[in-house]
């Protein structure tokens, strides 16, 4: 039996650049550090459900447009 693990992925960078927001601007909008935004974009950190929803609102995206499992 294969040991498959689902990975939580995101399209945060694409959505952010589509809006022409820098990491710093988005971070300020949602109340986190620029490093947190960078870590989420690179998959080093998974946002809490609350932060994920705040990011969706800030970027005018549905949850499933920003976050998915692979």
Go through each PLM region and give its residues:
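Short, charged recognition helix plus adjacent turn
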Residues: 1-2, 67-70
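DNA major-groove recognition helix of helix-turn-helix/homeodomain DNA-binding modules
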Residues: 50-65
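Short alpha-helical DNA-recognition segment
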Residues: 20-38
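Residue-level signal for the short linker/turn that defines the boundary of a DNA-recognition helix
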Residues: 10, 20-21, 47-50
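A short, Lys/Arg-rich alpha-helix, primarily the initiator
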Residues: 1-18
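Alpha-helical residues within the helix-turn-helix
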Residues: 17, 28, 57
